[in-house]
């Protein structure tokens, strides 16, 4: 599976992506809104979880790579999450901090939304984030998402 934009290629993760993904998901700034940055085992598990999602659902979080160089700069895609007691399709994204404020998250997320509506049964996607995650909230707004509800869930 490959999705392309003007600047990006989104593709399935492989085990060879570990080093680049570890650099992103182990960074305390990137993972500020998670309980803690990911360690080696958690990143390996993240890749495996997404590979299982590709098999089980036909989607997951995909590697976000620069089109001109192939450099992996993040992830973006759809996962099934328990939101308010319901299993719902959630769009998520993480971008390497060296590539923040350049529109890569919104560019990747916009093409993922288009892909999801064309290739899945879903007619609605969700973005579940910690209330204080202003950058992610702004990205969600930029791609046309609307706030539906706030949850009193401190861990998320």
What are these regions (language model features)?
Residues 1-32, 65-156:
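Acyl-donor (CoA/ACP) binding surface of acyl/acetyltransferases
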Residues 29-49:
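Conserved GNAT-fold acetyl-CoA-binding loop/helix
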Residues 38-42, 60, 87, 132:
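Short, conserved alpha-helical segments within structured domains
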Residues 41-48, 60-61, 98-100, 112-115:
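Low-complexity, flexible helical/coil segments
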Residues 49-51, 78:
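Short, P/G- and charge-enriched loop/turn segments at secondary-structure junctions
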Residues 51-63:
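A short helix-loop-beta-strand connector motif used in the catalytic cores of GNAT acetyltransferases and
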């Amino acid at each position: 599976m490959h999705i392309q934009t003007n600047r990006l290629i989104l593709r399935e993760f492989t085990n060879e992506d570990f080093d680049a993904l570890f650099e992103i998901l182990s960074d305390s700034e990137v993972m500020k809104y998670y309980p803690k940055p990911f360690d080696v085992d958690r990143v390996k598990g993240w890749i495996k979880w997404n590979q299982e999602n590709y098999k089980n659902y036909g989607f997951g979080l995909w590697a976000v790579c620069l089109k001109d160089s192939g450099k992996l700069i993040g992830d973006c895609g759809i996962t099934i999450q328990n939101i308010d007691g319901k299993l719902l399709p959630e769009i998520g994204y993480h971008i390497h901090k060296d590539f923040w404020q350049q529109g890569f998250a919104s560019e990747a997320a916009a093409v993922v939304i288009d892909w999801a509506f064309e290739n899945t049964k879903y007619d609605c996607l969700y973005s579940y984030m910690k209330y204080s995650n202003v950058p992610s909230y702004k990205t969600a707004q930029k791609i046309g998402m609307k706030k539906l509800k706030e949850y009193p869930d401190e861990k998320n």
